[in-house]
Amino acid sequence: MTSVPTVSDSKRAFYAAYPRPINPLYRRVVEELLVEIHLLSVNTSFVYDPLFALGVVTAFDSFMSSYRPIEAVGPLFTALTQAVRQNPEQYRHDANAIAEQVRGVGSDTIRQWLTEAEALGNAPELVRSSFQAIAGRSEFKYSRLFAIGLFSLLETAAPDLVQDPEALKTTVTAIAERFHLPSDKLQKDLDLYRSNLEKMEQARITMEEAIQADRRKREQREQEKLAKAAAAEAPAALEASSDNPEPETSETPS
């Protein structure tokens, strides 16, 4: 009988795959995602689908968008997904594929697909199969990452929809009713996700301002050091000049 990996096992695997230092602000994001994906992946009710992949990719990319160096973001995602025994290439591929199938279709169309039983059959393949599977399961394992995937799907289909709080709430409630999802929890998870994005951005700005202030202080100290050195050299140069007066030139009488 194969033992189920623990959260500690997944964390060790992650830090073995990515041993470099991670900024504390972003390390918390990565660890929370790792724990969440781990707990879902070992749950017998969990079933992977492109919508979940979209949620994982969206959450990671959104929270890590300001991470520096930017070249480290890809390896971080790879280490994260592989640590929880998932395939990073599949996640990226499936997330991009389902998003592209709804890009720009508009709020009316996406609402019809996801709230009217007959209309779902007209939806693109990945959207149709993902939501038909949800409807057909006797026990669907809801998660925050599913909620983020749904939000990203709506945002990709109709950016104006997610900018209108009332329209978004009405749509999410209708989708929850259609697929027997926990409406209140779904709405709270989306509100929390958006709130956390704002907090993350504010923290990033504060951190950047602190870095800039520290850089200015270092530059100022360096300038002051150079000024003091120049001031100390000036008297010595003046003294050397007075010790070596230029010889007088005598005029030749005409």
From Swiss-Prot:
Region (Disordered): 213-254
Keywords, in A-Z order: Coiled coil
GO CC annotation: plasma membrane-derived thylakoid photosystem II
Feature: compositional bias, Low complexity: 228-240
GO biological process: photosystem II assembly
Skewed-composition ranges (Basic and acidic residues): 213-227
Top-rank taxon, per record: Bacteria
Ranges in coiled-coil conformation: 183-217
InterPro entries documented for this protein: Thf1
Pfam family of the protein (one): ThylakoidFormat
Start-end of Acidic residues biased regions: 245-254
Function: May be involved in photosynthetic membrane biogenesis.
Similarity comment: family membership: Belongs to the THF1 family.
PANTHER family reported in the protein's UniProt record: PROTEIN THYLAKOID FORMATION 1, CHLOROPLASTIC
NCBIfam families from the UniProt entry: PS_II_psb29
Protein name per its UniProtKB record: Protein Thf1
Organism: Synechococcus elongatus (strain ATCC 33912 / PCC 7942 / FACHB-805)
Lineage, uppermost ranks: Bacteria, Bacillati, Cyanobacteriota, Cyanophyceae, Synechococcales
Name of the coding gene: thf1
